[in-house]
Amino acid sequence: LWTLNAPHLYKMKTTVRMGDKVIDQKFTNFGVRTVEWKPTGFYLNGERVQLKGVCQHHDLGPLGSAAHTRGYERQIEILKEFGVNSIRTSHNPPAPEVLDLCDKMGILVIDELFDIWQCSKEGVNNESFNEWHERDVVNLCHRDRNHPCVIAWSSGNEVPEQGMKNLHHISQTLTDLFHREDPTRKVTSGCNNANAARNGFGDTLDVYGYNYKPWAYKDFAKAVSYTHLRAHETSQ
């Protein structure tokens, strides 16, 4: 089994042949594990695991934001030294090297796709969402779904739509797309609008991701119809 303390991996070789001629070949690492989200918490291989994580941006300080495998590895080593067992890739998909390392080093990952949907936060960067969101979901799922470290997909982070009932359908559309491409994983989103847990937005998610206000968790857990609540951000 793939576990946090013993992240055992297998290698699968896929070969495409045309007659006797090999025309393509690919090696894929994968791990065997089960993931469950219950009202009592998160379970890996049937055992309850408390997620102790960070929101990990893709920059590497003075090394820059380009993928640097040893830089990522050192980051994860430091995180593990002070007890981290999970990472949320804020606020965009990680470099493939990050997931390879998390597979190898036993780190759980919430794989986040968007920071902006249809509504812009800064007046820019939202022009292509309607045209590209489906393809982006498909590409992310197809790229990352074989990684045992990935335990959930995150469709967004603090999007303005969480407070607009007439736009909640966008969240439902994204959740449905993730389920279509990968029915084995839950979908979450980082929410910073306190009312989003009650106004119906949370019902479009499998796991409600709460940003800050930890004092309100118990009250919201009693008030809403869904059972999965997770702290996405609690401090900066």
What are these regions (language model features)?
Residues 132-207, 212-214, 223-224:
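Active-site neighborhood of glycoside hydrolase catalytic domains
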Residues 97-101, 216-223:
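A short acidic, amphipathic alpha-helical/loop segment
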Residues 93-94, 116, 192-194:
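Conserved beta-strand edge residues that scaffold enzyme active sites
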Residues 57-68, 82-90, 115-131, 155-166, ...:
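The substrate-binding groove and active-site-proximal loops of carbohydrate-active enzymes
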Residues 108-116, 228:
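Beta-strand-loop-alpha-helix segment that lines the small-molecule cofactor/substrate pocket
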Residues 76, 197-199, 218:
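Short hydrophobic/charged patches on amphipathic alpha-helices used for structural packing
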Residues 1-109, 136-146, 151-152, 169-171, ...:
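Secreted/periplasmic carbohydrate-active enzymes, especially glycoside hydrolases
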Residues 227-234:
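Conserved small/polar residues in nucleotide/adenosyl-binding loops
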